[in-house]
Curated annotation (Swiss-Prot):
InterPro entries in UniProt: Ribosomal_uS8, Ribosomal_uS8_CS, Ribosomal_uS8_sf
PROSITE patterns documented for this protein: RIBOSOMAL_S8
Protein name from the UniProt record: Small ribosomal subunit protein uS8
Organism: Flavobacterium johnsoniae (strain ATCC 17061 / DSM 2064 / JCM 8514 / BCRC 14874 / CCUG 350202 / NBRC 14942 / NCIMB 11054 / UW101)
Family: Belongs to the universal ribosomal protein uS8 family.
Coiled-coil segments: none
UniProtKB keywords: Ribonucleoprotein, Ribosomal protein, RNA-binding, rRNA-binding
HAMAP family tied to this protein: Ribosomal_uS8_B
Encoding gene per record: rpsH
Stored PANTHER family: 40S RIBOSOMAL PROTEIN S15A
Molecular-function GO terms, alphabetical: rRNA binding; structural constituent of ribosome
Length: 132
């Protein structure tokens, strides 16, 4: 049993990218679905599909690679706020990742969103992870 399901999710994606897998299957939860939707909307993954094959269900994610160089689009994905040490940031303090080339995923009172969207709405929250 793992104590941090989001870290497990990010590690599965990171390992699949490192092994050049085309698809990764992850146990589902509402938070994981929202993170996956953000990754899709931002162009980091090709597609995703929710499957209700068990009580919990699973998410199948098709990873995205560059057509010419075959390099993965996701260079790194890092967990920031952890169960033992939560990291919060106000709207003004939300970080820019690699000068705007990456994204921060933030859990706000208005839902899960990118750091850029949170700044536009002037809301802060818990910084879940960085993707670049």
């Amino acid at each position: 049993m793992y104590t941090d399901p989001i870290a497990d999710y990010l590690t599965r994606v990171r390992n699949a990218v490192a092994a050049n897998h085309k698809v990764v299957e992850i146990p589902a939860s509402n938070l994981k679905k929202e993170i996956t939707k953000i990754l899709f909307d931002q162009g980091y993954i090709l597609s995703y599909k929710f499957e209700q094959n068990t009580v919990q269900g699973s998410i199948k994610i098709a990873l995205k690679y560059d057509k010419d160089t075959k390099e993965p689009v996701i260079k790194d994905i890092q967990r920031i706020s952890k169960p033992g040490l939560r990291k919060y940031a106000g709207a003004a303090k939300l970080p820019r990742i690699l000068n705007g080339l990456g994204i921060a995923i933030v859990s706000t009172s208005k839902g899960l969103m990118t750091g850029k969207q949170a700044k536009q709405l002037n809301v802060g929250g818990e910084v879940i992870c960085y993707v670049y």
